[in-house]
Swiss-Prot record:
Database matches in InterPro entries: Capsid_hemagglutn, Hemagglutn_HA1_a/b_dom_sf, Hemagglutn_influenz_A, Hemagglutn_influenz_A/B
Name used for this protein in its record: Hemagglutinin
Assigned GO CC terms: host cell plasma membrane; membrane; viral envelope; virion membrane
Subunit annotation: Homotrimer of disulfide-linked HA1-HA2.
Cysteines joined through disulfide linkages: C20-C480, C58-C290, C71-C83, C106-C151, C294-C318, C487-C491
GO MF terms, alphabetically ordered: host cell surface receptor binding
Role played: Binds to sialic acid-containing receptors on the cell surface, bringing about the attachment of the virus particle to the cell. This attachment induces virion internalization of about two third of the virus particles through clathrin-dependent endocytosis and about one third through a clathrin- and caveolin-independent pathway. Plays a major role in the determination of host range restriction and virulence. Class I viral fusion protein. Binds to sialic acid-containing receptors on the cell surface, bringing about the attachment of the virus particle to the cell. This attachment induces virion internalization either through clathrin-dependent endocytosis or through clathrin- and caveolin-independent pathway. Plays a major role in the determination of host range restriction and virulence. Class I viral fusion protein. Responsible for penetration of the virus into the cell cytoplasm by mediating the fusion of the membrane of the endocytosed virus particle with the endosomal membrane.
Record-annotated site: Cleavage: R343, G344
Glycosylation sites: N26, N27, N39, N142, N170, N181, N302, N497
């Protein structure tokens, strides 16, 4: 009877005072990826991939863009009559051109080295138009009749505003010899052209002379062009073509023109007033009366994040473009009810804590205690502050390293450079793939480190308590310790702050531990006796049942019994 009572006493042992080490939990549903796992729910995380834009064209650092609307760069610089609103433009931050502007070269033809000209304009922020050869200075040539129905204005034939189409006057076209000296302190952009008639009749009707040329020379340029008379299909009602050229005239340099026909002379030129970081962006958007540091063709980005996936082409101080759809850095610990027992990639031991505590709100790591005075949570603020500072510095370092001024603008190639253009696109795609891979790998590795860092911090707290308590408490295996002595709130606080007095409680703990161990040993003997008794009794009952069954079967003939001697 006494042994049974002891056994029942062991079963009903009351739990002692306990202290547990754990981590903060909340209602967060934020998920991150690591090298080892995907979609790990964490208490706190920081998105470093910008996905949003405002859908507008904005000023860049307070300077408005030059939005050409339906005009092309060529139509603007030559002075297409439909582009009069751009005859004089203020400083711009970048130039916006539609994919297929309708007002370009109204008189059909070509613009020599047009892609290079656009590249020049993409590194310019302001030009100023000046007159270099007045229209009324062509006294021996007709400077007013050179118009075309292909360049209409108010229902009448017109021509480009910034050049003069010179034709014969009084049935004569004297040889032109003109020189202009650039006395400005700025470089000068000069444009001119040559007309290619459709037939010989048009040639003599316009210029009198049949064998004509246009010669242009500077200190670096020596060009002589001959009109090409040929039958061509009509474009904008014209069989003829005009080919335009351009050059940059340095300060104190001169440009000389000589021609006896077919000359499209410059009236205005452009001073390159300000060079800088500009670009030509293709977009159909309109100005949105806003300001930004980063502009894309689909809208402005206002973000401090180091990466974005809005559009590969950008202007300004922009995050780096990557092809990723998700880049999230973990900052807080895991936020799951159960943590699988595992070892992290970087060596931190995880899994001895069963779950997080939503009741602990003032720290990432801490304690939960229970004793006769009650129970409660207490954050370990020192380890929490160190962790917050470390992770914040790491995140800021990643952002600072990646969030540098970065521009990616489109490049112009002519029809003869398609293979170069394709190669350029392949190279850019390759760079984007590398950036994307590096960004994703960086995030995966840092998230793995962060989660292991949190696990390590909790483990350090656990070890701190274990080293203090030693054999004054029992490890329960779930992040908790059960004391072998009474531990009031003052005692609990001493464990938390590292001042626990082990000798003070060691004698009480030893006595309680020995008493519990003795009860365990006595109960073990009781269990052995009960086990033997149970085994013998069950064996005897089984033998009686088998004998009775055999006797019954023999009596009714179901079983024959033979005894052989």
């Amino acid at each position: 009877m006494e042994r049974i009572v002891i056994a029942l006493a062991i079963i009903s042992v009351v739990k002692g005072d306990q202290i547990c080490i754990g981590y903060h939990a909340n209602n967060s549903t934020k998920q991150v990826d690591t090298i080892m796992e995907k979609n790990v729910t964490v208490t706190y995380a920081q998105d470093i991939l910008e996905k949003e834009h405002n859908g507008k064209l904005c000023s860049l650092k307070g300077v408005r863009p030059l939005i050409l609307k339906d005009c092309s760069v060529a139509g603007w610089l030559l002075g297409n009559p439909m582009c009069d609103e751009f005859l004089n433009v203020p400083e711009w931050s970048y130039i916006v051109e539609k994919d297929n502007p309708t007002n370009g070269l109204c008189y059909p033809g070509d613009f020599n080295d047009y892609e290079e000209l656009k590249h020049l304009m993409s590194s310019t922020n302001h030009i100023e138009k000046i007159r270099i050869i007045p229209r009324n200075s062509w006294s021996e040539h007709n400077a007013s009749s050179g118009v075309s129905s292909s360049c209409p204005y108010n229902g009448r034939s017109s021509f480009y505003r910034n050049v003069v189409w010179l034709i014969k006057k009084n049935n004569s076209y004297p040889t032109i010899k003109r020189t202009y000296n650039n006395t400005n302190v700025e470089d000068l952009l000069i444009l001119w052209g040559i007309h290619h008639p459709a037939d010989a009749a048009e040639q003599t009707r316009l210029y009198k002379n049949s064998n004509t040329y246009v010669s242009v020379g500077t200190s670096t340029l020596n060009q002589r062009s001959i009109p090409e008379i040929a039958t061509r299909p009509k474009v904008n009602g014209q069989n003829g073509r005009i080919e335009f050229f351009w050059t940059i005239l340095r300060p104190n340099h001169a440009i000389s023109f000589e021609s006896n026909g077919n000359f499209i002379a410059p009236e205005y030129a452009y001073k390159i007033v300000k060079k800088g970081d500009s670009a030509i962006m293709r977009s159909e958007l309109e100005y949105g009366n806003c300001d930004t540091k980063c502009q894309t063709p689909v809208g402005a980005i206002n973000s401090s994040m180091p990466f974005h996936n809005v559009h590969p082409l950008t202007i300004g101080e922009c995050p780096k473009y990557v092809k990723s759809n998700k880049l999230v850095l973990a900052t807080g610990p895991r936020n799951v009810p159960q943590r699988r027992k595992k070892r992290g990639l970087f060596g931190a031991k995880a899994g001895f804590i069963e779950g997080g505590w939503q009741g602990m709100v003032d720290g990432w790591y801490g304690y939960h205690h229970s004793n006769e005075q009650g129970s409660g949570y207490a954050a370990d603020k020192e380890s929490t502050h160190k962790a917050i500072d470390g992770i914040t510095n790491k995140v800021n370092s990643i952002i600072d390293k990646m969030n540098t001024q970065f521009e990616a603008v489109g490049k112009e190639f002519n029809n003869l450079e398609r293979r170069i253009e394709n190669l350029n696109k392949q190279m850019e795609d390759g760079f984007l793939d590398v950036w994307t891979y590096n960004a994703e790998l960086l995030v995966l590795m840092e998230n793995e480190r962060t989660l292991d860092f949190h696990d390590s911090n909790v483990k350090n707290l656990y070890d701190k308590v274990r080293l203090q308590l030693r054999d004054n408490a029992k490890e329960l295996g779930n992040g908790c310790f059960e004391f072998y002595h009474k531990c009031d709130n003052e005692c609990m606080e001493s464990v938390r702050n590292g001042t626990y007095d082990y000798p003070q409680y060691s004698e009480e703990s030893r006595l309680n531990r020995e008493e519990i161990d003795g009860v365990k040993l006595e109960s073990m003997g009781t269990y052995q006796i009960l086990s033997i008794y149970s085994t013998v009794a069950s064996s005897l009952a089984l033998a009686i049942m088998v004998a009775g069954l055999s006797f019954w079967m023999c009596s009714n003939g179901s079983l024959q019994c033979r005894i052989c001697i």
